[in-house]
UniProtKB/Swiss-Prot annotation:
SUPFAM superfamilies: DTD-like (SSF69500). It comes from Variovorax paradoxus (strain S110). This is D-aminoacyl-tRNA deacylase. GO terms for biological process: D-amino acid catabolic process. PANTHER family: D-AMINOACYL-TRNA DEACYLASE 1 (PTHR10472:SF5), D-TYROSYL-TRNA TYR DEACYLASE (PTHR10472). The keyword RNA-binding applies.
Length: 146
């Protein structure tokens, strides 16, 4: 399971011109399930995200988590994180989980996130989405659970 985590001042996801998910300060999480991923990987990814200390404390050091600041999580499915371009210029997505399994793992992750954190918004799995964000920093962290 892979994720790109961006610290944001705000973020939202629109589908067909309608906002379907939005947060203020917090984390935008672009999430990708890969072949062979399991629920335990999603659990570890969520635990890492909730405790990741990438928000500034009073001294300006990255020492606070999204939980510490009461921030939001905006979780967006992003199968293209599984792209492989080693064989040419056109990406291959064969490492991405099959659509049914990808959806199941995404839904599992979102369900667990909502149980663990009070502010969780989402995009829509498999939809054509427009993601709008105000990157804070910018701070962008790639995560991978194996």
């Amino acid at each position: 399971m892979k994720a790109i985590v961006q610290r944001v001042a705000s973020a939202r996801v629109d589908i067909a011109g309608q906002t379907v998910g939005a947060i203020g300060a917090g984390l935008l999480v672009l999430l990708c399930a890969e072949r062979g991923d399991a629920d335990a990987m999603a659990d570890r990814m969520l635990a890492k995200l909730l405790k990741l200390r990438i928000f500034s404390d009073e001294a300006g050091k990255m020492n606070r988590s999204v939980q510490d600041i009461g921030g939001g999580l905006l979780v967006v499915s992003q199968f293209t994180l599984a792209a492989d371009v080693s064989g040419g210029n056109r990406p291959s997505f064969t490492q991405a989980a099959a659509p049914d399994e990808g959806r199941r793992l995404y839904d599992y992750f979102v369900h667990r996130a909502r149980a663990a954190h009070p502010l969780v918004a989402t995009g829509e799995f498999g939809a054509d989405m427009q993601v709008h964000l105000v990157n804070d920093g910018p701070v962008t962290i790639p995560l991978q659970m194996a």
